[in-house]
Curated annotation (Swiss-Prot):
Organism field: Caenorhabditis elegans
Biased composition (Polar residues): 473-482, 736-759
Cystines in this chain: none
Phenotype seen when the gene is deleted: Mutant embryos do not display the anterior cortical contractions associated with pseudocleavage and do not form a pseudocleavage furrow. Cortical actin foci remain uniformly distributed rather than the asymmetric distribution seen in wild-type embryos. Approximately 20% of mutant embryos fail to hatch. Those that do hatch are viable and fertile and display normal P granule localization. Increased embryonic lethality in par-1, par-2 and par-3 mutants.
The entry's keywords: Cell cycle, Cell division, Cytoplasm, Developmental protein, Nucleus
Keyword check for Mitochondrion: no
Coiled-coil blocks: none
Disordered: annotated segments: 1-46, 334-361, 379-413, 440-495, 732-759
One GO term of the biological process aspect: mitotic cytokinesis
Protein name: Pseudocleavage protein nop-1
Domain of life: Eukaryota
Length: 759
């Protein structure tokens, strides 16, 4: 019989023939697997693919990545093993099991010490202190004396502190990084599995150093679902303490409800001890006896609103020392109330007495207005504090209001609903508030779009808040209406009065006034040179008293071109060649982007304004109001800007004077069609009204003389000025508006201050 044919696989020697061969069970987890060529080979491609899928799924489920050449760092430093949450006895007795003997591994300890996280003792004997960074609630401090014992303070979630005394050599070793522990900030507190090197393997092969590091360092879960627990917040621990405290003082509540009551009001009967020098009078004594304190539960997102209690609550309470006497909230007791539990028992003890005597009218207008009388729910403090408990219980009991949790999400809706309820009902304050402060809320006509009954907090329409909100003033002891159109009309009237006081309409055209002013200046100069000319001047000026009043201006505003030459004929009558040269030098030397300037070394002082650069034809609001279809828009823009810039420059150069007067006229007008146009006249008065809206833009004691370009233009300006006077006189003759009207308080017959327009 022939010998069997040798195969290629028989040439390789078997590892089991060697003496130092170890089986799979005898091999340690950190030893490297030596795979031979024919060993552990997959039989097919599909089995290898399934094996790869299973290995990747396992890595994803355990949240561990493959080994890399770099050592993984600890992502969450609060997971160090020096803090532990175990029982009080196991912290002190079982600490030796938590720190295995890993200190013998010299190579790993050397690597960690090289990273300068664990302190290395210095060669000399000096005492050097190493302070590790703060980790969670623990702080480690090492000294160079390795034989000294250190104390690790571990703050437990139960609120007590315990110490662990260990040798500094073992704690400072790599066991800090490799030892499994319980995390005190985790709710479940389970230990996380970590491998440690056995004692019989002291010498570690260099080839396995990487696998040891990757397995020794604990990997932190990346998601909350894989972490096995979420950190316990401080608010959660406080709520647990509240529940434990409330369960000890609620014997009458069933056991299944004892832990659900976490938001209760503690009745404080004894006043808080204060210093002797702090005396608050009767108000302090009242609040000490009648204020119910409340606890805010921030973790559950609710807040209990404090309310003022009365003296009857103290008399009707079960006892001053009893705490947390809440109502029973089980569904069975709500549906089938027993005979022993009456309706008064099911009502809350905190607001029982206050809701018994609150009538329907006071509940609908429950606005606490903190003024001199301090009315609380329609009653003053003295009245509510001095009432007898018997009188309160004898009043007819009203049905209980629907109670709703006062969270921050619907707080604004509740406030506005209170204001709406107060505005719908007419509140009589004669019984609670003294007679001088009496006002009634009335319905307004909503056709004008200014209704006093709205859903926002801004329109506080309750009777109690009428006396302190939105009242501009009072006429004949009555409060002015808060209607928006009325307030706007009053503001326009005030600006119109200011305009009438600060604007003087000249009966002489501006060109003639400038000529007379030049003559007056020349005469004054001659008067200084020759005293004999004084008598002749007084005789000649006695007949022109009306014109001399309009000549009392010290500043004149003119319109010029970009090269310094006069723009209009009115400016040309005042500016000669010498003055035009000085204006041109001022423009070149002191260029200003606002295209205006002044010359103060002249009498009268000169304010010059240049026209605006032409822009695209965009119709503005003022152009549409003035209805200037026949006038160029650039012309109106120059009229308004010229007037505005001249007034601002006039205020700047005369801010140190007590008073000043400036002559103005319609600027940048070159034809009769332009200066006599209704749009030009309206633009002038609208700009003056807009400037006087802010008094800071006007000279404090300054006035302007408005003169026309031609005699016809003077008449048109005078007519517009008289219309403003008439509108103010008619509105003042209307008298005070009645607050009991069913329509808007503004009279339909009155004339508005929109210049010349009737409502």
């Amino acid at each position: 019989m022939s010998a069997p044919k040798k195969r290629k696989s028989d040439i390789h020697s078997d590892d089991r023939d060697h003496a130092d061969h170890q089986t799979k069970k005898e091999k340690h987890w950190f030893e490297e697997k030596s795979e031979q060529n024919g060993e552990n080979r997959r039989s097919s491609i599909f089995k290898g693919f399934l094996k790869k899928v299973k290995s990747s799924t396992t890595l994803k489920s355990t949240n561990k990545s493959a080994s890399s050449s770099k050592m993984d760092t600890i992502a969450n430093e609060t997971h160090l093993s020096i803090t532990s949450e175990s029982s009080i006895t196991s912290v002190e007795s079982c600490h030796s099991a938590q720190f295995p003997n890993v200190a013998k591994n010299a190579m790993l300890r050397t690597l960690v010490n090289r990273d300068s996280f664990t302190p290395v003792p210095p060669p000399d004997g000096e005492s050097v202190t190493f302070i590790l960074p703060e980790i969670g609630s623990s702080k480690l401090e090492f000294t160079s004396k390795m034989d000294d014992a250190i104390s690790i303070e571990s703050r437990m979630s139960i609120g007590s502190c315990h110490t662990i005394d260990e040798d500094s050599a073992s704690i400072g070793s790599t066991s800090v990084f490799c030892t499994p522990s319980r995390n005190p900030l985790m709710r479940n507190g389970l230990r996380m599995s970590t491998r440690s090197v056995p004692e019989n393997q002291d010498d570690m092969p260099p080839a396995l150093f990487r696998s040891l590091c990757n397995s020794a360092v604990r990997r932190v879960p990346t998601s909350k679902s894989e972490g096995g627990g979420t950190p316990m917040r401080r608010s959660m621990r406080m709520s647990i303490q509240k529940r434990n405290l409330s369960s000890k003082n609620m014997e009458d509540v069933p056991e299944e409800e004892a832990l659900t009551v976490s938001n209760s009001s503690i009745r404080v009967d004894a006043p808080i001890a204060e210093e002797d020098e702090e005396v608050f009078g009767a108000a302090k004594e009242y609040f000490d006896n009648n204020v119910t304190s409340h606890n805010d539960s921030a973790d559950e997102g609710t807040c209990s609103m404090s309310r003022l209690s009365t003296t009857s609550e103290r008399a009707s309470g079960v006892g001053g020392s009893s705490i947390f006497q809440g109502r029973r909230s089980s569904i069975f007791r709500k549906i089938f109330p027993g005979k022993s539990e009456s309706k008064d028992r099911r009502m809350s003890d905190n607001n029982q007495a206050s809701e018994q005597y609150m009538d329907k009218k006071s509940r609908r207008a429950s606005v606490v207005s903190f003024n001199e009388f301090t009315s609380v729910s329609g009653l003053s403090v003295n009245d509510s504090a001095s009432k007898n408990p018997k009188d309160l219980t004898e009043s007819p009991q009203q049905p209980k209001l629907r109670k709703k949790t006062a969270s921050s999400s619907n707080l604004s809706q509740r406030i506005s609903s209170v204001f709406r309820m107060g505005s719908n009902s007419t509140v009589k304050l004669n019984e609670y508030v003294p007679s001088p402060i009496v006002s009634q809320s009335s319905r307004r006509n909503t056709l004008t779009g200014n209704s006093s009954i709205s859903s926002g907090v801004g329109s506080i329409a309750s009777g109690t808040s009428d006396q302190g909100y939105g009242t501009i003033g009072s006429r004949s002891g009555q409060s002015i209406s808060r209607c928006g159109s009325r307030r706007d009309d009053e503001g326009k009237k005030e600006r119109t009065r200011r305009l009438l006081d600060r604007i003087i309409i000249s009966d002489v055209p501006a060109g003639e006034l400038l000529k007379l002013k030049i003559e007056q200046v020349k005469k004054q100069k001659q008067l200084e040179m020759d005293e004999l000319f004084e008598t002749q001047l007084t005789e000649s000026s006695s007949s022109d008293t009306s014109q001399s009043e309009n000549l009392q201006f010290d500043v004149v505003a003119v319109d010029i071109k970009a090269d310094g030459s006069p723009f209009s004929t009115t400016a040309a009558t005042f500016m000669d060649s010498e003055l035009s040269k000085r204006v041109k030098e001022e423009i070149v030397s002191n260029y200003r982007p606002d295209r205006c300037g002044s010359i103060t070394e002249y009498e009268p002082e000169l304010v010059f304004v240049m026209p605006e650069q032409p822009q695209a034809s965009l119709k503005s609001l003022n152009d549409s109001v003035s209805s200037n279809a026949d006038i160029n828009l650039d012309h109106l823009r120059n009229v308004r800007s010229g007037l505005c810039k001249s007034i601002e420059e006039w205020k700047r150069i005369t801010k140190m004077r007590e008073s000043s007067t400036m002559l103005i006229y319609p600027m940048f007008c070159q034809s009769e069609e332009e200066w006599d146009s209704k749009g030009t006249i309206d633009a002038i008065f609208l700009m003056l009204d807009g400037i006087l809206m802010n008094t800071k833009r006007w000279m404090p004691n300054g006035k302007c003389i408005l003169a026309g370009v031609t005699p016809n233009n003077v008449i048109l300006l005078r007519n517009k000025f008289d219309e403003l006077k008439l509108s103010v006189a008619i509105s003042e003759s209307d008298g005070p508006a009645s607050s009991n009207d069913d329509f808007d308080t503004q009279s339909t017959a009155s004339t508005s201050t929109v210049f010349g327009a009737k409502i």
